[in-house]
Amino acid sequence: MSRPRLTRWHASSAPRSASSEVRILAPLQPKGPAAPIAANAGGQLIYAIGDIHGCYDQLRTLLKRIADDAGADAAERKPSLIFCGDYVDRGPASAQVVEALCWIKRHGPFATYFLKGNHEQVMLDYIADPGPVRSWMRFGGADTLRSYGIAPPDADDPIEAHVMARDDLLERMPVAHLRFLEQLELMIGAGDYAFVHAGVRPGVALADQSPEDLLWIREGFIDEDRKYERIIVHGHSWVNERPTVLPHRIGVDTGVYQTGVLTAARIEDDGVTFLSAR
């Protein structure tokens, strides 16, 4: 069975259209109208997984549900998993999550694609030079260090304390974890969909989006009601435990580290449904 055709975005890839509608699996209901989305997935079955944030138990449960769901699909096609970034920070088990994703990448039965989130970028920045990003400790970095068995310094501690913590992290973190983080993608395209972590800058072609916007954007994207070259599937911004479903974008981050709910969008030519795990 050949690998599904998911690619990095190229501006020359013209989107196609087909009639489909959004369907929501109970008990979740979408934020916003469940308006019809004229889109296809290129004949593929895709699961787009929202921000995990160190919540290993929910990840394990969701992957089991995805495996069961994919196994019930009669079509002769290899499903694809697209992880939408923010694997680390805030939850208690970032190291376990990264280890699980490394295993899935090497041995899993699905085609797998991993997007970079802003939290992975800050973690990599801390590894490169902790001084400018000591504030990482305030928005989840301390939880990630603890998951690797490291006592985190306070954000305001002297730079020497952060250099020591960084060095301890490099000693304890498996090389495979670092390589995994370094190889994350910024955007993946499939059919009429583009998958990113945070969103895109309105008025800028997908091929010309900046890494900063793909990783960090909120204002100017989530409050903008406009069509893009493709339907944007993203994480990063959440309201509650319900996914966001709009004609121009689908938000799969459901704030698992606070709500306890991890969500995946199931995307195929017939439409979009959702799986969730607590």
Task: Label the predicted regions.
Residues S2-R278:
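Feature recognizes metal-dependent phosphohydrolase scaffolds
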